[in-house]
């Protein structure tokens, strides 16, 4: 196994169990590891400190273990996946009769940086965000099949768009096990078509489950606007919550089709719903003041720190329009899923938008990702989803 030696003092973050080694912290290599290989990491005093997947880039090593005697083998993957599953079962997410849609592995939050696994009924969708996880995909899939047993029939690998383009990895999406065409999953008693073949992320935004459920509590009798609706999750929950009407908007015609399918799947023939394929900002410009519950759940405006300024301007602009148009006594659910945007950045952008609109605004809830998207206490960067529920006078 190749060795990586750190510069003096650069081991401090690893002593605090942070799961990344940045390229600037490395003094030299003992040999020339290939991307995705497991390497041992040593301090400048030649003391072992951790091991992980090597990759060319800013994050040079993603830590898999802080134990020198722990091999990264089949037993390792089985053990880690079992721990992840047992945690979700113990908190009532896995093996829940009303919900078979959840995240089984959430990267650093489950001490498996670079790996995401979502469960949709009897299909697991696996996604690699690092070269190492891609190269280990078959071993991971075998361990996953053992741990889940008869709870899943299919494992679909979806990493064509998540791996670094400079790495010669040639990932191909496809089934590693099974191949079922059944793509309907259950979330708190509601059914959803999951497009893991061509949809965004793994096919569904699992991280908004609890926030969708919260919105259902506020929907009764309200006119609801769901912006950036994608699969229509918030729309379906609002309708079950007895909303007066629900309008879904997305720039993608395919997303609108999927939203309409999901509404029809749960509430066939319900005339309270209408969907529009239109740019969000244009729709907000032309709409009247008929809505008293608005959801703003845009795609990530900033995927990197260098895009932060423009992202914050985008959040301000979007929220100003919502504040200006929402009815008095209305409720605004507003989100950011950009990891580069901190909780403080996002709140400041929304507060600025409120002030610019001249409306009186109160915070009802401060939202984040659900328990199946855990954040390692040693990796605060993992808290990426920010949300506010606001009462607008």
Predicted feature locations:
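C-terminal catalytic and target-recognition region of SAM-dependent MTase-like enzymes
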Residues: 331-393
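S-adenosyl-L-methionine
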Residues: 254-295
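Conserved SAM-binding motif I beta-strand of class I
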Residues: 245-250
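Non-catalytic accessory regions of SAM-dependent methyltransferases
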Residues: 1-115, 119
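Conserved SAM-binding loop of SAM-dependent methyltransferases across substrates and taxa
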Residues: 231-243
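Conserved class I S-adenosyl-L-methionine
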Residues: 221-230
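Mobile active-site "lid"/loop adjacent to the S-adenosyl-L-methionine
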Residues: 291-321
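Non-catalytic substrate-recognition/targeting regions of SAM-dependent transferases
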Residues: 105-118, 134-205, 213
């Amino acid at each position: 196994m190749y060795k990586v030696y750190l510069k003096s003092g650069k081991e401090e973050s690893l002593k605090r169990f942070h799961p990344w080694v940045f390229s600037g912290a490395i003094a030299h290599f003992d040999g020339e590891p290939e991307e995705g290989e497991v390497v041992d990491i040593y301090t400048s005093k030649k003391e072992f400190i951790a091991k992980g997947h090597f990759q060319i880039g800013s994050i040079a090593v993603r830590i898999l273990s802080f134990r020198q005697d722990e091999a990264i083998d089949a037993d390792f993957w089985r053990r880690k996946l079992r721990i992840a599953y047992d945690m979700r079962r113990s908190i009532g997410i896995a093996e829940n009769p009303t919900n078979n849609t959840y995240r089984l592995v959430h990267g650093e939050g489950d001490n498996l940086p670079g790996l995401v696994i979502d469960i949709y009924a009897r299909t697991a969708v696996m996604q690699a965000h690092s070269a190492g996880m891609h190269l280990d995909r078959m071993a991971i899939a075998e361990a996953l099949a053992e741990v889940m047993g008869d709870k899943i029939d299919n494992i679909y690998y979806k990493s064509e768009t998540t791996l670094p383009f400079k790495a010669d990895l040639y990932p191909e999406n496809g089934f590693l096990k099974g191949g079922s065409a059944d793509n309907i999953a259950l979330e708190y008693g509601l059914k959803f078509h999951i497009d893991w073949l061509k949809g965004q992320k793994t096919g569904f935004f699992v991280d908004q489950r609890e926030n969708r459920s919260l919105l259902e509590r506020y929907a009764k009798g309200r006119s609801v606007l769901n912006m950036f609706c994608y699969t229509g999750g918030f729309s379906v929950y609002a309708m079950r919550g007895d909303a007066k009407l629900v309008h879904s908007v997305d720039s993608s015609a395919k997303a609108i089709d999927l939203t309409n399918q999901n509404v029809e799947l749960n509430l066939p023939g319900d005339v309270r719903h209408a969907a529009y394929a239109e740019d969000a900002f244009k729709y907000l410009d032309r709409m009247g003041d008929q809505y008293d519950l608005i959801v703003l759940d845009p795609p990530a405006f900033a995927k990197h720190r260098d895009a932060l300024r423009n992202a914050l301007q985008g959040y301000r602009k979007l929220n100003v329009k919502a504040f200006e148009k929402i009815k008095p006594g209305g409720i605004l659910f507003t989100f950011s899923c950009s990891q580069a945007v901190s909780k403080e950045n996002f709140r400041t952008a929304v507060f600025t938008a409120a002030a610019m609109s001249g409306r009186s605004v109160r915070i009802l809830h401060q939202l984040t990702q659900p328990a199946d998207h855990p954040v390692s206490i040693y990796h605060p960067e993992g808290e990426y989803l920010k949300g506010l529920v606001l009462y607008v006078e």
